[in-house]
Every structure is written in structure tokens, then in C-alpha cells.
Swiss-Prot record:
The lineage of its organism: Bacteria, Pseudomonadati, Chlorobiota, Chlorobiia, Chlorobiales. The active site is at 127 (proton donor). This is 4-hydroxy-3-methylbut-2-enyl diphosphate reductase. Pathway: Isoprenoid biosynthesis; dimethylallyl diphosphate biosynthesis; dimethylallyl diphosphate from (2E)-4-hydroxy-3-methylbutenyl diphosphate: step 1/1; Isoprenoid biosynthesis; isopentenyl diphosphate biosynthesis via DXP pathway; isopentenyl diphosphate from 1-deoxy-D-xylulose 5-phosphate: step 6/6. Its EC number is 1.17.7.4. Isopentenyl diphosphate binds at residues 41, 75, 125, 257-259, 306. [4Fe-4S] cluster binds at residues 13, 97, 229. It holds the Pfam family LYTB.
């Protein structure tokens, strides 16, 4: 049985890498550090850092904290968090992902220009909470591209100028499906960009938004900006190919991970013999037995952008030692 470890489309993204690196440096220096929320949506990695001295706190605890240092994770935070920090004399170590920080700026400018901001994402995801905070929490969050959730679309003002953006880790096809359905919905209520045949919304760039904000040419009434992180979305096709190339897939990620859910579904669609775990104690021996009763020929180990590479190596090592490995893979 060959064990193949995916190093090209699995493991921490750049934003999470930066956060973990800073957290480790701070902990090495002082042995203690507060983190607002889980530093990453991976329980195993959180426990590793907590063992080094990190303390994870929630918003109520953060609001009671005084004169301490607090890490802001890659997901980012709304303006209210920074206001609390100033009020409570808290030193903020801000590791917001640059892609997320740029998106927050875009959301803020669109809101200031009077746009109703629609966010394709998950309402309680910390990144979305941070983005919506830039809109005074007035953004409309939609998770279902088919507009099937009436509660999600109920707040929409179909006569107002509107901009569509996205949580950085959502799926690209879903974003464009949502755009298409919003175009149809708004057009049915008589709101479309002048000169468009079927109510197409117009793509805008940062320079367009900045220009209007500084008194330049006005943007169309109905616009969209694809803000999905391409470093994340580019993994989709690679991971699909990886899943197809192996008899069995063991996908390691935290169950809180939004990206993990998306990537696992890609693996599962490509290869029905794909299994989700958080750690090695969930691995089952029957996964590695083929329909002929013999061991499968290959097992692929992969994970999410929030999965540390050391955990994937641990999984490969465990499977290799427990069930056998003839690939010559040094990680197994």
C-alpha cells in the first residue's frame, strides 16, 4: 500500500502561516499570549499552542481583560474589537490575513458610498463578522447561492444600489451562481443597470471604488467584486486530481473549518472512498480494504488551509506504521 502525502494543495495558507509564526514567536519570548477566538479552526493545532502558553478567550472575556497582549488571528476582526482594545489598554498583535484586510477595506468603502453590501459567506464565521463590521453590521449575508433561504434574502432592498462581495474561503462557482440569481431577482423587480439586456451586474476593481470615493466617476448601481482568495480556490482542482489519483483519501481538518468542509466535499465528490478526521484516533482499518478484500493500493493524505503539515505527516506516519507502507515515503 502506497501512502501519498499532498504537499502542494494541503496545509496552511499564507495568512494562517503568518499567524502561527507570530504566535510561536510571542510564546517563545514570554510564554503567554491571549488569542481572541481559536487561532485557527483546527482543534489539534489550538491545543498544541495552548500547551505552549496561549490562552484562547471569547468576546466577553476580551471585554473584561485589561493591560494585556492579545493576538488577532488571520480571520480579522470588526472595528468594535479595536475600540475595546483601546478602551481596555490592550496591546493588539494583529495578524489579519492581507487578503482579508484588503477585503475589509473594500467593504468599508462600498458601504461609505451608499451601497447595500451583500456578503457571500457564513453569517457566524469570524471573517464575515469582521467584514460586516466594516458596514456597521448592515451587510446582508447570504450562504445559499440558489437564494433558497427566505430568511437570508428577506433583508434585501431590491430597489437600492447594491454590491456583492464574498468571504475569501467560499467556492468560486457558488459566488457566480449567486451573482446570476441576484441579477435575475433584482431585474424581476425592475432594478437593473442602464443599458444591460438581462440585468447584468458590473465587475468593479479597487481603483473604481477608490476613484468614486474620492470624487471620481460614479460606479453603476449594481456591482460585484470577486474577493475569493485564489490561493485557496486554486487548491480545488489540484485536490480533485489528487483524490482521483488515489484509491482512498484521508482528509484531516478541524470540523469548525469552513474551508475544510469545502475541500472535503471536493474530495468526496471525486472519490467516494474519502474520509474526514480531526486526528489519528478516528482512523478506521476498514477504510484501507478494497472491494476484493485486499488492501487498497494507494492512500492519499490531504487537508485544509487550516490543517498544519505536521498533522498530515502524523497521519501518514500512523497509517504507514499501522497498516503498512511500501512507497518509500519518508513521512510514513
Amino acid at each position: 500500500m502506497k501512502i501519498n502525502l499532498d504537499r502542494t494543495s494541503s496545509g496552511f495558507c499564507i495568512g494562517v502561516q503568518g499567524t502561527i509564526h507570530v504566535a510561536e514567536e510571542k510564546l517563545n519570548q514570554s510564554g503567554e499570549l491571549y488569542c481572541l477566538g481559536d487561532v485557527v479552526h483546527n482543534e489539534v493545532e489550538v491545543k498544541r499552542l495552548e500547551a505552549l502558553g496561549m490562552e484562547t478567550i471569547d468576546i466577553p472575556a476580551f471585554e473584561e481583560l485589561r493591560d494585556a497582549e492579545v493576538l488577532i488571528r488571520a480571520h480579522g476582526e470588526p472595528p468594535s474589537t479595536y475600540e475595546t482594545a483601546r478602551r481596555n489598554n490592550l496591546a493588539i498583535t494583529d495578524t489579519t490575513c492581507p487578503v482579508v484586510a484588503k477585503l475589509q477595506k473594500t467593504a468599508k468603502m462600498l458601504h461609505q458610498l451608499g451601497y447595500q453590501v451583500i456578503i457571500y459567506g457564513k453569517k457566524i464565521h469570524p471573517e464575515v463578522i469582521g467584514i460586516n463590521g466594516q458596514c456597521n453590521d448592515e451587510g446582508v449575508v447570504i450562504k445559499h447561492p440558489d437564494l433558497s433561504d427566505e430568511a437570508e434574502i428577506a433583508p434585501l432592498d431590491l430597489g437600492r444600489k447594491t454590491a456583492l462581495i464574498s468571504q475569501t474561503t467560499m467556492d468560486v462557482p457558488g459566488f457566480y451562481e449567486l451573482k446570476k440569481n441576484l441579477e435575475k431577482l433584482f431585474a424581476e423587480h425592475g432594478h437593473r443597470n442602464p443599458g444591460t439586456k438581462s440585468g447584468e451586474w458590473m465587475a468593479v476593481r479597487d481603483i473604481d471604488i477608490t476613484s468614486e470615493k474620492t470624487g471620481g466617476r460614479a460606479m453603476p448601481e449594481l456591482v460585484y467584486k470577486d474577493t475569493i482568495c485564489r490561493q485557496v480556490s486554486s487548491r480545488n482542482g489540484k485536490l480533485r486530481d489528487f483524490a482521483l489519483a488515489n484509491d482512498c483519501i484521508v482528509f484531516a481538518a478541524g470540523r469548525k473549518s469552513s474551508n475544510g468542509q469545502v475541500l472535503y466535499s471536493i474530495c468526496k465528490d471525486a472519490n467516494p472512498h474519502s474520509y474526514f478526521i480531526e486526528d489519528v484516533d478516528e482512523i478506521q482499518p476498514e477504510w484501507f480494504v478494497g472491494e476484493n478484500g485486499k488492501p487498497v493500493e494507494s492512500v492519499g493524505i490531504c487537508g485544509a488551509t487550516s490543517t498544519p503539515m505536521w498533522l498530515l505527516e502524523k497521519v501518514a506516519n500512523y497509517i504507514g506504521k499501522t497498516f503498512g507502507d511500501d512507497s518509500g515515503n519518508p513521512d510514513a
